[in-house]
From Swiss-Prot:
Antimicrobial peptide. This is Brevinin-1AVa. Keywords: Amphibian defense peptide, Antibiotic, Antimicrobial, Disulfide bond, Secreted. The lineage of its organism: Eukaryota, Metazoa, Chordata, Craniata, Vertebrata. It is found in: Secreted. Disulfide bonds join C11-C17.
Length: 17
């Protein structure tokens, strides 16, 4: 899991970008 990918996933799930 890449850090950038993890950040993108978290953004999608929490709706906090």
């Amino acid at each position: 899991f890449l850090p950038l990918l993890a950040a993108s996933f978290a953004c999608t799930v929490t709706k906090k970008c």
